Amino acid sequence: MLKFKQKFIDRYSELTDFDAFKEYSEKRIRKSFRVNTLKSTVSNTKKRLEKYFEVEPVPWCKEGFFIKDTKRIAVGNLREYMLGYIYIQEASSMIPPTILKPKPGDFVLDMAAAPGSKTTQMAAMMKNEGLLIANDYKYDRLKSLSSNLQRCGVANTATTLQEGRFFKGFS
């Protein structure tokens, strides 16, 4: 059971139903993934994955799916993962790109890009057209970012290693 400091409880009780917040905080996060439409279609990938597990759509992301049963196989070991057809991504992480709705030809700056879940999602939404700057301020995180960009076939992205203040006035 989670223990919250009183100051935290006081603060968040003003913003939300704290009992509901606490209940959801104690729940196990459901495993989820997103189909990478740069490399495959949603229907083709769903069909390929049916032999491993059942999926349920993520309501706010048409390429996102919850995995109903992961006990039989490690998703990161699947051929579909290695080929970049899917990206293991928490469903909550699919929300920002879905709200931003980047389009082909747009110019997008991702300030905290590693390991690349939202970056690869935006690149797919942009159909690899336009420019996506994938920035992170920690050198050791760029390796996973670069690896994921390559695995997912992202071609419209430049990676940078800067603190956020470097981009002040960036437009």
Each language-model region and where it sits:
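S-adenosylmethionine
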Residues: 1-171
